[in-house]
Design a protein with these regions (language model features):
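Amphipathic alpha-helical dimerization/coiled-coil segments
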Residues: 96-121
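DNA-recognition alpha helix
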Residues: 39-51
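Short, hydrophobic-biased segments on the C-terminal half of alpha helices
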Residues: 57, 61-65
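Beta-hairpin "wing" of winged helix-turn-helix
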Residues: 68-84
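Basic, amphipathic "hinge/linker" alpha-helix immediately C-terminal to the N-terminal HTH DNA-binding motif
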Residues: 81, 85-102
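Intrinsically disordered, low-complexity serine/threonine- and proline-rich regulatory segments
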Residues: 1-22, 101-105, 111
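Hydrophobic residues on short alpha-helical segments
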Residues: 24-29
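Short capping segments at the starts of secondary-structure elements
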Residues: 30-40
Length: 121
């Protein structure tokens, strides 16, 4: 039982570190096909990750501001029926190219048959 507890604790720590590094990936994936407001990005991340990833709206706003400053994300403002205009974020051409290269270098490697075989043994 002690061994299982240790594995669970180590796994939780590993996943927390892993999740922190994945937020950018999930935000870019959310914006890959269409413009989204922060609430839609949050919902996309939680739904597509099957609940594995969750993020606070404040974290998303902070990251989106950083990405905007770097020129990889921009936004259009749209009027909504109530309240202030809503910002709909999208990847710029540089952001799209950056995301594509990241996927090619870091994600598609996991689709290689040799890697799949190791993961599923």
């Amino acid at each position: 039982m002690e061994k299982d507890l240790m594995i669970t604790e180590l796994l939780n720590a590993w996943e927390e570190t892993y999740k922190k590094g994945q937020l950018t990936f999930w935000v870019f994936l959310a914006l890959k096909e269409e413009n989204k407001c922060v609430e839609e990005i949050k919902e996309f991340v939680e739904t597509m990750s099957e609940g594995f990833m969750s993020c606070e709206e404040q974290s998303l706003y902070r990251n989106l501001r950083k990405f905007q400053h770097l020129g990889i994300v921009a936004y259009d403002s749209k009027r909504v029926s109530k309240g202030p205009d809503r910002k709909y974020y999208y990847l710029t051409d540089i952001g799209k190219a950056l995301f594509q290269r990241f996927v090619e270098r870091n994600i598609l490697i996991f689709t290689k048959e040799s890697i799949i075989n190791l993961l599923t043994k």
